[in-house]
């Protein structure tokens, strides 16, 4: 299970501080999710926190 950030990312940075496992970081043009680290917030929240705060709705299942 993992998520990814699509090219629609606006580089707003809302998602990065929401990740409890620090799987989100700034790429060159968009934020990226380390798919090997992403847990979709299992054990931390009922649903992925980054998805809830993304204004561009660009965080999807990998």
From Swiss-Prot:
Cofactor stoichiometry and binding remark: Binds 2 [4Fe-4S] clusters.
UniProt binding sites for [4Fe-4S] cluster 2: 19, 38, 41, 50
Domain 4Fe-4S ferredoxin-type: 2-28, 29-62
GO molecular function: 4 iron, 4 sulfur cluster binding; metal ion binding
SUPFAM superfamilies, sorted: 4Fe-4S ferredoxins
Lyase is among the record's keywords: no
Top-level taxon of the source organism: Bacteria
Pfam families: Fer4
UniProt keywords, alphabetically: 4Fe-4S, Electron transport, Iron, Iron-sulfur, Metal-binding, Repeat, Transport
Coiled coil segments of this chain: none
Summary of the function given for this chain in its UniProt record: Ferredoxins are iron-sulfur proteins that transfer electrons in a wide variety of metabolic reactions.
The protein, known as: Ferredoxin-3
Record organism: Chlorobaculum tepidum (strain ATCC 49652 / DSM 12025 / NBRC 103806 / TLS) (Chlorobium tepidum)
């Amino acid at each position: 299970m993992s998520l990814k950030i699509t090219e629609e990312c606006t580089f707003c940075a809302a998602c990065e501080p929401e990740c409890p496992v620090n799987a989100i970081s700034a790429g060159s043009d968009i934020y990226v999710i380390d798919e090997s680290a992403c847990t979709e917030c299992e054990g931390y929240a009922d649903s992925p926190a980054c998805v809830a705060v993304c204004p561009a709705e660009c965080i999807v299942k990998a």
